[in-house]
Amino acid sequence: MISNFGHIVKTYLSNFPKDDYPVLDTFKFVSIWLGLVLDQSQTSMRSMFKRLNLRGETVDISTFSKASKKRDVGVFREIIFSLKKELSKRKEIKQGELEIFPLDSTIVSITSKLMWNLGFHQVKVFSGINLSTGIPGGIVIHFGQGHDNKYGNETIEETPENGVAVMDRGFCDLQRIKRLQKENNKYHVLRIKNNIKLEKLANDNYMVGTGKNKIESRVVIFTHDNSEFRLVTNLPIESKEIEGVSDEKIAEIYKKRWQIELLWKFLKMHLKLNRLIAKNENAIGIQIYTCIIAYLILKLLVIPKEAGTTMLDKLRYLQAFMCEKISYVHWLRELALR
């Protein structure tokens, strides 16, 4: 195998304790979750544990489920933080360069009847993705239902300095726009709803909305596929801090919002975020964070050019070699002990 996967495992996983619990230590616990997400040959937790038990791993699914209910999700957040820190080193951002940060939420179905009985049938996950670095950020898990205009503030706050938060109509709220206008060195491009009143002013800005919440803002209007797009933004036409941004450029920035949808698509199609098999809130958080960890590992992974260059190529490359090692649990232990 020609890749840096072994280095990634030793750097970010091998330091976790291998003897802090008698049956299911932290290293094995994290390895099982990663195996569940990364192993394309496994379709359920039960089938994964069947393979593990047949090949010498004594931990059972009941012990794993209990651990998933009680173990600290901070371990998984710590891995995410370390991987993101390493990824950020790989891309040098030029001074004055705008970092585009499209963000959105996605709905993930819960399969556990125990959670259904508690009134939870789905989870809404918020995230953005920095297109300069490829790093997801501002990951927030919200149980239950609710419109994006009521939530998502934590994700928006993760917009990097000199970054542009790109949002769809679901995030449209006049009070939110007021807050965003006050941000220093952070910008936004937000599509507003078609029923919001616009009044053009003498300075070419618009008065957005009516009543006490109305606000003056730059608005860019364009049409695409017979649909009108009205974008509120605080990006300047002229500025000393950054290069001026034309209306056409703002329209192009908004079209990059689709990149966050591609993130959700990859996580759901290939890293098993399409349905949550965990049976409690803590375990659901762990499953979601594990999907993000797997995504970041793939971002860091380097494989031979002839094997491909896409994230899916990398996942398939790992799968081809994992098949020689019984499971990811066996393979990660072998790599960590080298």
Swiss-Prot record:
Keywords: DNA recombination, DNA-binding, Transposable element, Transposition. InterPro entries: RNaseH-like_sf, Transpos_IS4, Transposase_11. It comes from Synechocystis sp. (strain ATCC 27184 / PCC 6803 / Kazusa). One of its GO terms (biological process) is DNA transposition. NCBIfam families: transpos_IS4_1 (NF033592). It comes from the Bacteria. Gene3D superfamilies: Transposase Inhibitor Protein From Tn5, Chain A, domain 1 (3.90.350.10). One of its GO terms (molecular function) is transposase activity. This is Putative transposase for insertion sequence element IS4SA.
